[in-house]
C-alpha cells in the first residue's frame, strides 16, 4: 500500500532530522493522506480517492472536483485523475453545463 496522493501523485519526501546539538540524520516525511469521496457534479458520480490534505484544500478552493480537474494541467495529475478529467471534458463537450 503506497502512501501517494491519487490526484497529484505527491509521495513521501526526504530530509534531515536536526537534533538540539545540530546533528543531522536522514528521515522520511510522509504525506498526510485521507480517504475521501469526491462528487463530480457534471458526471453525477462519486469517486473514492486517497488525497493529501493540501490537495483536498486546493480542490475545495477551486470549487470542486470538476473545476479543479478542468483548470489543472494534465502534467500535474496522475493517470487516474487524467481519466476522470477526460470524462468530464467529454461531458462538457456534449453540452452539460458547468456551474461556477
UniProtKB/Swiss-Prot annotation:
Which molecular-function annotations from GO does this UniProt entry contain?
Answer: structural constituent of ribosome
Q: Which residues lie in coiled coils?
A: none
Which Gene Ontology cellular component terms are annotated? cytosolic large ribosomal subunit
Q: A GO biological process this protein is involved in?
A: translation
Please provide the record's keywords in A-Z order. Ribonucleoprotein, Ribosomal protein
Q: Which InterPro entries match?
A: Ribosomal_bL28, Ribosomal_bL28/bL31-like_sf, Ribosomal_bL28_bact-type, Ribosomal_bL28_sf
Per the record, the similarity remark reads: Belongs to the bacterial ribosomal protein bL28 family.
Write the protein's name.
Large ribosomal subunit protein bL28
Write down the species.
Ehrlichia chaffeensis (strain ATCC CRL-10679 / Arkansas)
Amino acid at each position: 500500500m503506497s502512501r501517494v496522493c491519487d490526484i497529484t501523485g505527491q509521495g513521501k519526501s526526504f530530509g534531515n532530522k536536526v537534533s538540539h546539538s545540530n546533528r543531522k540524520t536522514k528521515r522520511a516525511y510522509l504525506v498526510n493522506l485521507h480517504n475521501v469521496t469526491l462528487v463530480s457534479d457534471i458526471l453525477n458520480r462519486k469517486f473514492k480517492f486517497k488525497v493529501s490534505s493540501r490537495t483536498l484544500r486546493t480542490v475545495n478552493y477551486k470549487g470542486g472536483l470538476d473545476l479543479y480537474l478542468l483548470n489543472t494541467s494534465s502534467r500535474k495529475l496522475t493517470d487516474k485523475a487524467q481519466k476522470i478529467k477526460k470524462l468530464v471534458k467529454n461531458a462538457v463537450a456534449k453540452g452539460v453545463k458547468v456551474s461556477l
